Amino acid sequence: MNDFSRQDHWDKVYTTRGENQVSWFQETPAPSLELIGHVGAIRSSAIIDIGGGASRLVDCLVGQGYEDVTVLDLSAAALASAQSRLGDKANRVKWIAADVTAWEPTRVYDLWHDRAAVHFLTESADKAAYVSRLKAAVKPGGSVIIGTFAPDGPERCSGLIVSRYDAASLAATLGCGFELIDTRRHEHTTPSGVTQRFQFSTFRRGPDR
């Protein structure tokens, strides 16, 4: 799927379905918030949420006083939904409408968070581009939290084939330079009552060589 069709697909999803009509909806993103706390993020930490879309993680981060939050998503429609929900608080957030595989970071971050974005990348070139951006955007010693469908999770989502991971296969995809420091499973219940099995893995970015 090329960049244009990928964007078209996600814009259609976010303009034709309500916020709580998508399978990944969470009223409160508890696993992500817990892991962000575990890596020692402080209020001044630079945090980027990759594929954040209309997720409520940004609401929680702003509400908890985090001062340097960025949300990146391919779909401008998804970002507009989050901005509308936040109202004036949206001005406290930096918003980037871009495909992460083509994005060129202009700064570095203390924490990279991705819940259910990278698993939509199934081509090796897209995965390599993702890792390249990850390496460019996370400072040495920074943290990376990635949640994906587990090996026994769904094979498709929103009509698209996904890549499923466990901690070992995700670590292999990221390659050297990222130390696995935590992994856990999570069962997400969709708005329609279906259970989806996820894995969340946390990595620390090693020093530049």
Predicted regions and their residues:
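Short catalytic micro-motifs in class I SAM-dependent methyltransferases
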Residues: 116-120
